[in-house]
Amino acid sequence: MSLKDKIESDYNNSIKEKDSNSINTLRLIKSAIKDKEISLRGKQDALTDSDILSLLQSLVKQRKDSIEAFEKANRNDLIENELNEIKVIELFLPKQMDEDETKLIIKNIIQENNYTSIKEMGALMKIIKENYTGKIDMGLVGKIALSLIHI
C-alpha cells in the first residue's frame, strides 16, 4: 500500500469515527498532495512515496514555525491545534533518528570521505540526503555537521 493510499484509508476511517481533528489534518495533507501533483503535471507521472514524505516533513516544519510565532503572541489555543496537527502528520513519517544517532552517522561520513573543510559541507549534506531522507532531521544535521567539520 502506497503512502498516498494509507492517507486516503486513514481519512476514510477518521470520517467513520467522526474524529474532527484527524479529518481536518488529513484533508490538509490530501490537499497538499493534490497541489504538488498539479504543479508536477507533465514533468512527472505521479508522486512517489519519498516525494510525499518530503511534503509531510515540510508540513511539520511549517507547523513548528507557526508554533514559535504563536508562542511569541501568547496564543495557546492555536499552539494546541498545531501540535495536534503535527501528531497526525507524524503518523505517516518514519521515526526520526535522535541526536546521538545523527551525530554518529555524520562522524562516519566525515571520516570515510576525509572531509575537513566547510567547503565540503554540500557534499556531506548530499550523501545524507540520498541515504537518510525522511529518517533524519536535516536542520539538526546542518548544526551537527558544522560543529564536527570545524573541530
Regions found by a protein language model. Give the residues of each.
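Hydrophobic, aromatic-enriched alpha-helical segments typical of multi-pass transmembrane helices
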Residues: 145-146
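Short, hydrophobic/aliphatic alpha-helical segments
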Residues: 1-8, 123
